[in-house]
Amino acid sequence: MKLLSRDTRLVCELALCPLALVFWSILGVRALDNGLARTPTMGWLHWERFMCNLDCQEEPDACISEQLFMQMAELMVSDGWRDAGYDYLCIDDCWMAPERDSKGRLQADPQRFPSGIKHLANYVHSKGLKLGIYADVGNKTCAGFPGSFGSYDIDAQTFADWGVDLLKFDGCHCDSVVSLENGYKYMALALNRTGRSIVYSCEWPLYLRPFHKPNYTDIQYYCNHWRNFDDVYDSWESIKNILSWTVVYQKEIVEVAGPGSWNDPDMLVIGNFGLSWDQQVTQMALWAIMAAPLLMSNDLRQISSQAKALLQNKDVIAINQDPLGKQGYCFRKENHIEVWERPLSNLAWAVAVRNLQEIGGPCPYTIQISSLGRGLACNPGCIITQLLPEKVHLGFYEWTLTLKTRVNPSGTVLFRLER
């Protein structure tokens, strides 16, 4: 099936009455304030792995259906994903029927979701999980299903009535900047008015940046997390592009991240087909450093034990979920090596050394301990543990010493430093 590009934007005009505009001006900075996502969201999202597969006759195990999500829910419990922290099961595009119902409400495709979304939400909740769903700010979703333009209130209430816990709100089919921004703000208010706690995942800056620089202070008022860059694909080139974009724009985005508000570099594709082992380690390590939502998109029925162990690595997850809530950043790039760091609670730090080369063998690299954590991480000394690609207790290092490591091509070594 040929999908409409997520970059496709058709005209949608949002006609807001003066009263609504006054309402926004009063409540704008408190529009979200939902107390959710105090640490980055963790879970599973169908899009990258299963896309918009609607053919349940030919591919019953891979089409977007309630069967797929119920199977994933079962595995998230039985295989330890929920206990590791992955507690959101998220539906992306292509779950809807082609038309709204007679009352103007969104409805699930009756053949692929015969029991409806409320039933699925109840099932997911019975497993101790939470359900995420997808909608779009414009006239249509990216795949051409009904959009939420003009129906923000009724859609928000529908999701609340169903028991939805997260909304991923896309930005296709809306090429008016005013419409785009107002639509995202209005949906935040509409979700709050339902009285239900619903994590709000936006793609606002992704669609805004081609027109002007996003106001991230504004965006963080309304969204729990937000996409900045292109969709991730199951390829190393895609991961590299996301990381390169992040380094270029980190001065804009790092400071606005924190409890309840996160930059989202998109899904984890670990356990699929396109990344080598070292590249999977790099994605896991850098997503932890970036305090990114950890939303896997893979097939939990077929995932390898090695990929599962990486995704469930409790030490790496602890860095990602650190309650201090500070996003990490790249602070050094020399030749083909990048060094990233992230401040953690209790004066700890995470440090990642990434090898940009894709040829040759492991690259030796030496770090001055005094340079880490803005000179504070190991002053006067610290205990260093290598967490990835394997856990190694390296011991106590004084501030005046050096740390030597070797990093595989396209790989990353992740350390934790504790005072």
Swiss-Prot record:
SUPFAM superfamilies linked: (Trans)glycosidases (SSF51445), Glycosyl hydrolase domain (SSF51011)
Residues at the active site: 170, 231
GO molecular function, one term: protein homodimerization activity
Pfam assignment, any one: Melibiase_2_C
Keywords: Disulfide bond, Glycoprotein, Glycosidase, Hydrolase, Lipid metabolism, Lysosome, Phosphoprotein, Signal
Sequence positions that bind substrate: 203-207
Recorded superkingdom: Eukaryota
Cysteine disulfide partners in this protein: 52-94, 56-63, 142-172, 202-223, 378-382
Predominant place of localization: other
Gene Ontology biological process terms in this record: aorta development; glycosylceramide catabolic process; negative regulation of nitric oxide biosynthetic process; negative regulation of nitric-oxide synthase activity; oligosaccharide metabolic process
Reaction(s) this enzyme catalyzes, per UniProt: Hydrolysis of terminal, non-reducing alpha-D-galactose residues in alpha-D-galactosides, including galactose oligosaccharides, galactomannans and galactolipids; a globoside Gb3Cer (d18:1(4E)) + H2O = a beta-D-Gal-(1->4)-beta-D-Glc-(1<->1)-Cer(d18:1(4E)) + D-galactose; a globoside Gb3Cer + H2O = a beta-D-galactosyl-(1->4)-beta-D-glucosyl-(1<->1)-ceramide + D-galactose
Regulation (activators, inhibitors): Galactosylgalactosylglucosylceramidase activity is stimulated by saposin B and ammonium chloride.
InterPro entries xref list: Aldolase_TIM, Glyco_hydro_27, Glyco_hydro_27/36_CS, Glyco_hydro_b, Glycoside_hydrolase_SF, Melibiase/NAGA_C
EC number(s) from the headed UniProt entry: 3.2.1.22
GO CC, alphabetical: cytoplasm; extracellular region; extracellular space; Golgi apparatus; lysosome; membrane
Assembly: Homodimer.
Protein name: Alpha-galactosidase A
